[in-house]
Amino acid sequence: MSCSIFKDLPEDHPRRLIPALCRQFYHLGWVTGTGGGMSIKLNNEIYIAPSGVQKERMQPEDLFVQDIDGKDLQMPPEIRELKKSQCTPLFMLAYRHRNAGAVIHTHSQHAVMATLLWPGKTFRCTHLEMIKGVYDDADKRYLQYDEQLVVPIIENTPHERDLADSMYAGHDGASRLQCRSGQTPRSECSDYLFSIAVEMKMAGLDPETFVDASKA
């Protein structure tokens, strides 16, 4: 870590946690190059990663801080010439309408492949163990192994801000798949499920259907 004025903050403070997670996500292949984004809400402060920065090199002082109304509270040093994440309008939707505590935008290859292999506007899978790690916000509970996970797929746009209406429209789940881009997820369980479901599709299996081998 650099000699930052924020070095004495606890490790779980957003100024330290966001750079640490972005480095982890970079090594997982979720935020390669300058792609992807992340934000964490702490009390009345919303911490937002900058745009156009290599995620594995991000520092605590690089973050933007604003309130729920969009008023800037703290900015990165001017010499860094940083811009706030283009995902900011989408982050704010989650905070204002879903009472989210954090939002992550990944460019997972598994999520991208899922948008290409699933026709229509939804990704679906069932009877996969990690479904139990996905929280159903509508029912306020975790899904069961034998239930169906449904994730909307929305069309990509040239600019992130133009996705706001599609992100907001008509779904109570925690994630969205952005066609040919990635996901705004409960990340690890979702990424695992996309990976397994894509492999099942490519092997000629149907992730949306359960086949009881004992009755075959």
From Swiss-Prot:
GO terms for cellular component: cytoplasm. This is Probable methylthioribulose-1-phosphate dehydratase. Belongs to the aldolase class II family. MtnB subfamily. Binds 1 zinc ion per subunit. The active site is at E129 (proton donor/acceptor). GO terms for molecular function: methylthioribulose 1-phosphate dehydratase activity; zinc ion binding. Pfam families: Aldolase_II. Zn(2+) binds at H105, H107. Its EC number is 4.2.1.109.
